[in-house]
């Protein structure tokens, strides 16, 4: 029979390599955690502002929330969003300003989008980037107000509305041909960045997501902030009611896909409070007021 001393010695011999492996594993794990933490901290954090530049009074809620009472009306907010940080001033959507929209729509409380930035001390030429969530007139018409900005749009959105959409009268509702021509011209000038699909970080700390299906390839935006990720849903979620009642927007090409996008927004955002709908006037009361018509998303 082996002596206890010999057994202990053998156990020690076998244990040493195991302990060495364990220590190596712990070192690698700790390093990975530190790298991940450093990466998260190195992403720039932006200030995010919602800017109300106009109102559409008495808008039918049934055109915003699927299945809503047709008699319900709401004075909806027309908004753009400013992301400020990392040496950039980034707009999400550009609003509208051309005269013919005022005869086609009942617009009140209008401020030209380029002027609506003034309370934040931002001039039109200070805008470095404009992210167009989709090509509808009230989101894309003002892109040429910002002469030094790079315009970002989903590649499929540009290709569809510059081509196939016009082969039928039923596939370009809400799209103004002049806005399409402006976008094509800006592309020929080298000022358009094409976002190729879902989950694309186009600028450090700013990521575009697809799936809302408000238009052919509409996108929404996730923004890194000090409070965590803010989601700017734009028209992929018109009102808080869409999210709270888990109801798709009324104007979508795919209701199931729109609901999946809303569910995903909850996963992306640091908390549901930081999911910002596209036209809900309640945005202006849920967040701290910075100036008339301007709130800080936090």
What do these predicted ranges mean?
Residues 107-111, 216-298:
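Cap/insert and terminal regions of metallo-dependent hydrolase folds
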Residues 27-37:
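Bacterial N-terminal signal peptides
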Residues 53-54, 94-96, 135, 156-157, ...:
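Active-site metal-binding loops of divalent metal-dependent hydrolases
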Residues 47-52, 68, 73-75, 80-84, ...:
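Core dinuclear metal-dependent hydrolase active-site scaffold
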Residues 58-80, 84-129:
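Pre-active-site segment of Zn-dependent metallo-hydrolases
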